[in-house]
Amino acid sequence: MGLLNTNIWQDHDSELARISYSARMLYLLRGAICLDRMELAKRLGVTWPTASNTAEKLQKIGALRTVAQEAVSETGSGKSSYSLMVNPDYGYFVGISIGSSEIKLVVLDFNFDPLSKVSLQDYLCFYAESEGNPVVFDWRKYLMQSDATTNGYIKIPTPESAERFSATINQIVNGLIAADINQQNQSPSTAKHLLGIGFAFTGAVDVENKTVTESFNLPFLRGISYKTLISPSNREYLESQNITVSFQHNAKTVAIAEKYYLQKNNSPLGESEDIVSIYLGTGIGCGLIL
């Protein structure tokens, strides 16, 4: 989880630069699947030692893993005895979209791929009740997609008051915390940690202060913030585990997702500098990457 905690490298400017190299390296590997260190250095525009040191840090925390050369020979790499790829099991990210009528939740692995229905069930402890454990949040009532091989997601009706909304969100967060603790208890050395939770809202969002400043479709969300929405006990756990929580406008999240989707799927548009997304819901939103 240290990868997402910028405090670990805030003592020196030269070390801060490595955070950028780490993020860029992960971005490249999520699109290229696997690359050797020489090719990574070339694409990052840095020296081989810089790329190698960055990769070593990411490997040390488990974010990258090596692949034997024979397994990647068709990629044209061929410059090293092994190549590097993102370890999808390093940790998970949760996206929660707050709509006028529905709250939707999806879980992504570290390679930014949505979990299948079966994997989602496993991660969210769907079967904990049968093992004699208390159910923190009954995800089963809200699981979508009938095909086990397709991406699974959770869909919950949006409550109609601030009190019920806050209660529902905290039940969801409680369930995510329970899943995270369950992962650590089952296998601490290989636990798939919860790395971050992102909330996407309609209206106007102050991203830096994690506050919804205006909400036209859900007026009771006006002025709600991370500190007022998430209970103290849940915040304490999230912060103690360095789990990042972010607020963003839903149309902007669509633009960001489109950027990563194009890059991950090696689309000719993946390197486009300008992307526009139009979000059609109860209202109309627009996200821009320029």
Per-range role (PLM):
Residues 40, 117, 122-274:
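Glycine-rich phosphate-binding loop and adjoining helix at the ATP-binding site
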Residues 2-86, 209, 215, 243, ...:
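Nucleotide/phosphate-binding catalytic cleft detector across ATP-hydrolyzing
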Residues 66-68, 244-250, 288:
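General beta-strand structural signal in soluble alpha/beta enzymes
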Residues 78-119, 123-125, 141, 277-290:
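Gly/Thr-rich phosphate-binding beta-strand-loop-beta motif of the actin/hexokinase/Hsp70
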Residues 24, 28, 229, 257-258, ...:
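Alpha-helical scaffold segments in soluble metabolic enzymes
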Residues 73, 102, 114, 206, ...:
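Flexible, glycine-rich phosphate/dinucleotide-binding loops
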